[in-house]
């Protein structure tokens, strides 16, 4: 089973490609994997910051992340987190982010 350490390792190894192709500025892990509460059915929750908006290439980016991790990934941007209207959920996400 994937661990937060293995996810961080995979993402760090992919950083040169992610920066060059998508302009990734920073990636963070949150949710069950960040808290060590994952199970076999857990997806990987990430927050991705980009140098500039990537538009529809975000779909390609998400598919690439799922491919390298071998798991479904839910990816938010910092703006997406700010738009969460339930304050407790947004705060929980922000407090659990582990940047890689």
Region spans (language model):
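Catalytic core of pol beta-like nucleotidyltransferases
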Residues: 1-26, 35-36, 40, 51-100
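Conserved histidines in hydrophobic membrane contexts and catalytic metal-binding motifs
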Residues: 29
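Short beta-strand->loop micro-motif that forms the acidic, two-metal-ion catalytic signature
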Residues: 45-48
């Amino acid at each position: 089973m994937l661990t937060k350490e293995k996810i961080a390792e995979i993402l760090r190894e992919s950083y040169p490609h992610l920066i060059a192709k998508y302009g990734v500025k920073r990636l963070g892990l949150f949710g069950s994997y960040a808290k060590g509460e994952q199970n076999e059915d857990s997806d990987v929750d990430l927050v991705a910051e980009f140098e500039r908006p990537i538009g529809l290439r975000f779909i390609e980016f998400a598919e690439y992340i799922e491919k390298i991790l071998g798991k479904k990934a839910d990816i938010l941007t910092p703006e997406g987190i700010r738009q969460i209207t339930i304050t407790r959920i947004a705060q929980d996400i922000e407090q659990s982010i582990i940047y890689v």
